[in-house]
A protein has these predicted regions:
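Short helix-loop capping/hinge motifs at secondary-structure junctions, enriched
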Residues: 4-5, 186
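Accessory alpha-helical/coil subdomains and C-terminal extensions
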Residues: 13-114, 119-120, 198-207
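Polar helix-capping/helix-linker motif
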Residues: 6-7, 101, 120, 129
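Short, active-site-adjacent cap segments at secondary-structure transitions
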Residues: 5, 23-25, 144-147
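C-terminal non-catalytic interaction/assembly regions of soluble proteins
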Residues: 111-207
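N-terminal targeting leaders only when they are immediately followed by extended low-complexity/repeat-rich tracts
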Residues: 10-18, 186, 190
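Short beta-strand/turn micro-motifs composed of small residues
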Residues: 1, 19-20, 141
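A generic, well-ordered mixed alpha/beta core segment in the N-terminal half of proteins
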Residues: 1-2, 8
Length: 207
């Protein structure tokens, strides 16, 4: 659980959400331990604060929105999203079963390293066909740290040519939430792709 004093202090003094006393930003955080209370880690972004007897904030690392407005919960989320995890030996049947889910709008595709996948012709054709049907496919890395750089290797460039969009250094969790949010607000596939290439609340790093 949370330390009530520490949590209250953190809540009142910073504009960005933090996890527990580790002070890690929510948008870059993944759960990495099933047994430990200290279960969340942020590998692509440094801690925003260190909490002990006192709280020390790393102010330059904290995301500051352009304007400060009261919290507005967003309930319009489109759940027609799926995760496609690429693995060695993946079969056409597995990919086809996911890309042909009725009503599917977006896919978070977990790839190798800096955004690579097997260069199977059938895989590229299936991805291209899905994109042409209006499905937005976002490429995120399976690695805990690092970023998708689809221009780096030929396999990544082929994914770009098929219409796959870079997820940069987004976590899978954040990419899923972002797709749900964007489609939930009635955006077209092209509008969703445009918003995937920019940071809405500091959730991705674009050089």
């Amino acid at each position: 659980g949370k330390d009530p004093i520490t949590s209250e202090e953190l809540k009142n003094k910073k504009p960005e959400d933090l996890f527990k006393t580790d002070g890690e930003g929510v948008t870059f955080t993944s759960k990495t331990n099933a047994d430990n209370f200290n279960a969340f880690r942020s590998y692509n972004y440094p801690p925003l604060a260190h909490a002990g007897i006192s709280i020390k904030y790393d102010i330059p690392q904290i995301y500051h929105p352009v304007s400060r407005k009261p919290l507005k919960p967003h309930y319009l989320l489109d759940r027609n999203i799926a995760i496609l995890k690429i693995f060695p030996g993946i079969s056409p049947q597995v990919v086809e079963s996911i890309l042909n889910i009725p009503g599917l709008k977006g896919v978070v595709m977990e790839t190798f390293g800096s955004g690579n996948a097997p260069g199977y012709d059938w895989l590229l054709e299936m991805l291209k066909d899905a994109v042409e049907r209006g499905i937005v496919i976002v490429n995120v890395t399976q690695c805990l740290a690092g970023s998708v750089e689809m221009h780096r290797y030929e396999t990544g460039r082929k994914l770009l040519q098929a219409g796959v969009v870079s997820g940069y250094d987004s976590t899978t969790e954040c990419a899923v939430a972002k797709l749900m949010f964007l489609f939930g607000h009635g955006m077209t596939p092209d509008e969703v792709k445009e918003h995937l290439n920019c940071s809405l609340i500091g959730e991705i790093t674009i050089a």
